[in-house]
Amino acid sequence: MMTTLTARPEAITFDPQQTALIVVDMQNAYATPGGYLDLAGFDVSTTRPVIANIQTAVTAARAAGMLIIWFQNGWDAQYVEAGGPGSPNFHKSNALKTMRKQPQLQGKLLAKGSWDYQLVDELVPQPGDIVLPKPRYSGFFNTPLDSILRSRGIRHLVFTGIATNVCVESTLRDGFFLEYFGVVLEDATHQAGPEFAQKAALFNIETFFGWVSDVETFCDALSPTSFARIA
């Protein structure tokens, strides 16, 4: 059954059962003091409301029959998956640069199996959800995301997570190029960097690549009364 979500720059109509809620990289690395972003000098002090808003969005999406996909960004403990000097990721990843500056952190930042790599305690995938590792900013690169979505007839993606201006925007942009309709819930995301990075990412998304809404509006669109109005 179709529902309409109020969004910027205009409302968008979708079928929740042909839509996925994407939770991007809600790991200790990105949302918890002592994690990679914090150690690299980024401010993570205001991530707690984002976690709570994601919990709310996930609950509403699950009740509406939406697929929930959780991404975890990172690599093997030897960082082979991160790429060597021949990869631009080796030179641009702040996690890798931080570990080169602080060798005692090797094997601790974004390494699979580490505390840093784990999802935050408040966000726990449930049976029926899909958890996908990803080795780069975009969730479409070297992952089965595209085939998972296409095999289920999913064309609409609702994004939450960290960081808005890095992995969230990268994945939404790649989805746009693959003909997916991308919506970001702005109060369920958080930037890496100054506040203007959040504003710039949201501007890019709503102007060029997708739609922007918020958690309360999203939950209202998934309520039974909203479906009744559409019907």
Curated annotation (Swiss-Prot):
Pfam families documented for this protein: Isochorismatase
Keyword Hydrolase: yes
Keywords: Hydrolase
Active-site residues annotated for this sequence: 25, 134, 167
Entry-linked CDD domains: cysteine_hydrolases
InterPro entries reported in the protein's UniProt record: Isochorismatase-like_dom, Isochorismatase-like_hydrls, Isochorismatase-like_sf, RutB
BP terms from Gene Ontology: nitrogen utilization; uracil catabolic process
Catalytic reaction annotation: (Z)-3-ureidoacrylate + H2O + H(+) = (Z)-3-aminoacrylate + NH4(+) + CO2; (Z)-3-ureidoacrylate + H2O = (Z)-3-aminoacrylate + carbamate + H(+); (Z)-2-methylureidoacrylate + H2O + H(+) = (Z)-2-methylaminoacrylate + NH4(+) + CO2
Record EC number: 3.5.1.110
Keyword Hydrolase found: yes
Expression induction or repression: Up-regulated by the nitrogen regulatory protein C (NtrC also called GlnG) and repressed by RutR.
One Gene Ontology MF term: hydrolase activity, acting on carbon-nitrogen (but not peptide) bonds, in linear amides
NCBIfam families, per the entry: RutB (TIGR03614)
Function: Hydrolyzes ureidoacrylate to form aminoacrylate and carbamate. The carbamate hydrolyzes spontaneously, thereby releasing one of the nitrogen atoms of the pyrimidine ring as ammonia and one of its carbon atoms as CO2.
Protein family: Belongs to the isochorismatase family. RutB subfamily.
Name of this protein: Ureidoacrylate amidohydrolase RutB
